């Protein structure tokens, strides 16, 4: 009887969790910085287009992880008025802490900082986030936060519908003059701090029209019904400890940070910024972003992002190149791709192999569609783990020894390219909020398409069917053909097979 009563009491307590969310009326209103007066970033980045010039932006592709970090550091260090930062993941590791420190120093010199983080990956950051928020020029908000900070998983028992919807957006904007958006989160694996785990990813550094679009989009999310003040959610935190973390209290961590900073200062982009010689590409751009109400499953005034992305990329005439680390095409998506092939459109897909993926459940959702995709005539490639991709801007998606694919980019007819956070899976389409930019540029899209066509066969398995309709993986480096998932241990193959039997496709 006592056990039943305790269980009932625990359930009632858990059911009340969602009601513990603080009132949104306690938030202060703010909007992005806006001025036409010359500022430091205009000179540092040699900005040629104002944020209000319709559709025209200057972009610089960030395929190298060290350049990707250098760009972010440069924006923080050059900012005079505001920093608006929106991320799904911000890790408390070498790169994450270094950027946190630079942000704090920016606030010290008077820069207003708005930091919006999805709360799904902030475990262990509470002290540091409170320390940041304690600065009068920094405000931290959490998207769809967990009320229970220590026992977060319990929140899913009673608030699953809300907590299952995450903010997957990634943007990094300084003074409403320059922005970075694409696939990278903030963490060592995205910036090649160590060699054990490196993600092949892609961002753009941009000035011009797209910056204003990103700034207005950030304002929408900042004021959304899912964004809560961190101080109202984190009720127990140690601010002095968080300040110590910001100050590199650990000597080993401090030395690692200094070494990485030295590496960044040797990157080509860092030197280009110092010399005011960034080789910009002037292009037409269009921001594609979800309505933040998607985070609460509310009706949006905008069509789903997948529909708007398809409209922006337009109907293909010759070929489509799809790069998606998490690729779950679903039955309808597989049929749509097959129809393109039937109409004479070449379709190529690059995704992760089982051994390369960091989410085996997603791979299990994709695996069952491989045969239908291949039967329809789609070219299918799976990234090999631990393959050294060439380190120049003309080769591949990144310059590093890659352990996993994380870039999300789609190229249509060598004329239009999408770079952003959107994966070709049900979660991106229906559950998470996403964003990215469509770039109209035969020069950039065509070059990326040719580069992928030339280099992908050298670092990815070509998946085909043998004469008995069985899957096989061809490794061009060794000229070896595998009959099972290459390099994946038996237990991993079994786990993926079991996961494929579960009715979880809509969550992947």
Predicted regions and their residues:
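Bacterial N-terminal signal peptides that target proteins for export
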Residues: 1-6
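Bacterial N-terminal signal peptides
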Residues: 7-16
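Charged, low-complexity intrinsically disordered terminal segments
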Residues: 17-168, 174-508
């Amino acid at each position: 009887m006592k056990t039943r009563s305790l269980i009932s009491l625990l359930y009632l307590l858990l059911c009340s969790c969602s009601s513990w969310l603080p009132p949104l009326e306690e938030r202060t209103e703010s909007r992005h910085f806006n001025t036409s007066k010359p500022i430091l970033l205009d000179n540092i980045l040699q900005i040629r287009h104002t944020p209000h010039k319709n559709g025209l932006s200057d972009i610089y592709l960030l395929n190298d992880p060290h350049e990707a970090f250098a760009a972010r550091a440069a924006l923080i260090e050059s900012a005079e008025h505001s920093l608006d930062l929106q991320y799904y993941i911000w890790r408390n590791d070498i790169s994450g802490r270094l950027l946190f420190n630079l942000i704090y120093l920016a606030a010290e010199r008077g820069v207003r900082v708005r930091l919006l983080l999805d709360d799904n990956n902030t475990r262990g950051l509470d002290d540091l986030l409170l320390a940041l928020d304690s600065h009068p020029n920094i405000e931290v908000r959490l998207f769809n936060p967990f009320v229970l900070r220590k026992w977060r998983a319990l929140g899913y028992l009673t608030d699953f519908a809300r907590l299952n919807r995450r903010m997957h957006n990634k943007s990094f904007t300084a003074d409403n003059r320059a922005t970075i958006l694409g696939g990278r989160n903030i963490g060592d694996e995205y910036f090649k701090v160590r060699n054990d785990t490196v993600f092949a990813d892609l961002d753009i550094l941009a000035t011009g029209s797209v910056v204003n679009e990103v700034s207005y989009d950030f304002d929408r999310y900042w004021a959304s019904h899912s964004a809560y003040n961190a101080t109202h959610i984190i009720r127990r935190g140690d601010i002095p400890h968080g300040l110590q973390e910001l100050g590199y209290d650990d000597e080993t961590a401090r030395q690692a940070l200094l070494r990485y900073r030295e590496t960044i200062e040797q990157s080509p982009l860092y030197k280009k910024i110092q010399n005011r010689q960034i080789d910009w590409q002037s292009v037409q751009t269009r921001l594609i972003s979800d309505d933040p109400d998607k985070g609460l499953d509310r009706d949006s005034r905008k069509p789903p992002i997948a529909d708007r992305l398809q409209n922006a990329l337009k109907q293909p005439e010759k070929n489509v190149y799809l790069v998606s680390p998490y690729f779950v095409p679903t039955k309808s998506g597989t049929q749509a791709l097959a129809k393109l092939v039937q109409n004479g459109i070449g379709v190529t897909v690059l995704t992760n192999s089982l051994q390369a993926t960091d989410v085996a459940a997603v791979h299990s959702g994709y695996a069952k569609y491989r045969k239908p995709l291949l039967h329809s005539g789609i070219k299918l490639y799976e990234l090999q783990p631990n393959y050294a991709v060439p380190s120049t801007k003309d080769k591949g998606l990144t310059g590093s020894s890659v352990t996993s694919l994380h870039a999300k980019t789609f190229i249509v007819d060598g004329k239009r390219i999408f770079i952003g956070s959107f994966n070709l899976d049900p979660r991106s389409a229906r559950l998470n909020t996403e964003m990215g930019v469509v770039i109209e540029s035969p020069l950039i899209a065509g070059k990326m398409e040719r580069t992928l066509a030339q280099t992908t066969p050298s670092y990815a398995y070509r998946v085909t069917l043998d004469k008995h309709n069985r899957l096989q993986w061809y490794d061009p480096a060794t000229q070896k053909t595998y009959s099972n998932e290459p390099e994946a241990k038996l237990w991993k193959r079994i786990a993926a097979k079991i996961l494929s039997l579960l009715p979880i496709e809509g969550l992947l």
